[in-house]
Swiss-Prot record:
GO terms for molecular function: zinc ion binding. The keyword Protein biosynthesis does not apply. This is Zinc finger CCCH domain-containing protein 11C. Keywords: Metal-binding, Repeat, Zinc, Zinc-finger. PROSITE patterns: ZF_C3H1. Residues 391-402, 750-763 have a biased composition (Polar residues). GO terms for biological process: poly(A)+ mRNA export from nucleus. SMART domains: ZnF_C3H1. Residues 486-498, 734-749 have a biased composition (Low complexity).
Amino acid sequence: MPNQGEDCYFFFYSTCTKGDSCPFRHCEAALGNETVCTLWQEGRCFRRVCRFRHMEIDKKRSEIPCYWENQPTGCQKLNCAFHHNRGRYVDGLFLPPSKSVLPTVPESPEEEVKASQLSVQQNKLSVQSNPSPQLRSVMKVESSENVPSPKHPPVVINAADDDEDDDDQFSEEGDETKTPTLQPTPEVHNGLRVTSVRKPAVNIKQGECLHFGIKTLEEIKSKKMKEKSEEQGEGSSGVSSLLLHPEPVPGPEKENVRTVVRTVTLSTKQGEEPLVRLGLTETLGKRKFSTGGDSDPPLKRSLAQRLGKKVEAPETNTDETPKKAQVSKSLKERLGMSADPNNEDATDKVNKVGEIHVKTLEEMLLERASQKHGESQTKLKTEGPSKTDDSTSGARSSSTIRIKTFSEVLAEEEHRQQEAERQKSKKDTTCIKLKTDSEIKKTVVLPPIVASKGQSEEPAGKTKSMQEVHMKTVEEIKLEKALRVQQSSESSTSSPSQHEATPGARLLLRITKRTWRKEEKKLQEGNEVDFLSRVRMEATEASVETTGVDITKIQVKRCEIMRETRMQKQQEREKSVLTPLQGDVASCNTQVAEKPVLTAVPGITWHLTKQLPTKSSQKVEVETSGIADSLLNVKWSAQTLEKRGEAKPTVNVKQSVVKVVSSPKLAPKRKAVEMHPAVTAAVKPLSSSSVLQEPPAKKAAVDAVVLLVSEDKSVTVPETENPRDSLVLPLTQSSSDSSPPEVSGPSSSQMSMKTRRLSSASTGKPPLSVEDDFEKLTWEISGGKLEAEIDLDPGKDEDDLPLEL
């Protein structure tokens, strides 16, 4: 066939993208023509425009219906060679339907195979075949050869019919033994399968079958398969009989492990078809007979054997369940429960075969739950015996009630833990809230502390009624010990303080430091109950002045006691600094003794009646609300300035004094406090007995109040400081104001310059001469170490650390 002048296939049927560079012929006149040019076939067609096709016809397209005709858009090709049943419009031209008639009888061998497939699927013949695509190639080979017109045509069953074919396989195959399904078959060569001849229910010799051109190879393969099946059937006859996969006589060909075995029957005898159908019934009858006469129960038994004998399990359980019931009885007897009627019911129900599993499961659940409750009773002693008895009785009654009570017990424990955490979080938040509150809380809280020292035995009965006793933290225990040590130390220091009352402020400094030293040594001692009663009594007494928020007061006291312990070592360091100046301080005792005395009684709060601005006020008025209702105008005579040659009638102690005493870290907190209009100072005496019996202690309290009150109206007792450090540090200043600068060195001069800058930057209200002189004198007395001692507290004991956490 000459290649020259051959039509382009893509141009003829679709679109050629090569255009003029295509070596094949592009002739529009030949489009859609199904007549082959004879001259072109002979190689003698030299016409430029030949309206016949120069291409062999492999298919009769005029007899094949057009695919695009059934699509929504329809066939839009002008020269479509396929058959059209309906007319169509293409580019405005009407094309009539095709004149040729579709053939009803298939003429090509492939169409015969398709027709045979349809007929076999409809009739569902009992002839099995392989659904694999390899078989189709085999069938093409068979059909291409000259096979006489088969009355039983070769059959290919698609994979979509697997379920139906499986049913046919089980029903058709007889009782002959067969190898298990999952065995590899080496008979698949190069993707091709050879079908075998099989005549069911009758053992037919191979020589009786008709042999076609392929059948010689098939016969050889079938013999090999038969030999292998016999060898494997001997070894696994029992297993194969249980698996219910019998093997046909010639031996089926398997494609691979994943496919189901099928065979194709080819025959030319006319009497074979009724034999095949008779074979179906016979094989069914033989199968029923082979399984034991009756059809259903033996089949179930064989299935149970396939599944591992699970049907026999209830029979064994009937023997085992009474043992379980006895075990449960022994468990209940061990737990000491009277469950005899339940056990009798259980033993009666065990005898009933149908209810065995459910009843034993419930009993086992009941026993486990009751056993868990028996163990949990020892752990949950706080629940009480009545609750545990109720839970065990509920456990006997029903499993749901028992599970409820057990979960309720767990829920109660979790609820308790949540309440404890809530209390802790409330205590922590109240300490934080105290920093933003005004000092009214301190005035309310501190006097009951003083009052409780003399009345420590009274509130013991009241604390028992309080329900907060259970929620004790480590901090509260430490605070209890601290207050108890404080009470014992005050009672012990009352007698030596009476003897030292006459010397004055110098001995007063010693008394305070000695008291705090003893408290610091005895911080880890004491009883917890005394503190608890004291704290509760303080809270109840303070309820007269406040709304009765006891937890807030306790937290205030806790923070104050923490600050007290923090300032103890600072006072000891101050004492070491002030000891060389005690001789100078003694000269000031006469002047200090002339000051008006304020009697500090337990429960008395110190209120500022008048808030004086720093510029204009030169007098500080302190009102005692308990005993002395008169206003005492405490005037600072020029004690510190007389020795320095400055004669002023009164010295207004400015805000810079307190700023020197307190740490610079408190400056933002003072600014936060400036928004509160009321300024109150709470002075806590060292002890009720010592205050009542010591005039120097009263003078020291007056000095502390004067120093605290003489601050600016925006400055109050800082919340991070303790009232006691405000009591002690101003005492050191006021008592040692008149001392000459003997200890002043380079460090003190540097610190004085620093504080001058700090005070001038912080407030520009007071005159700088008085402020700077007073600050310089203060820093010379302290040796420049006062700020460092207040800011940094490096030498804290291990006992102080948990109080600060």
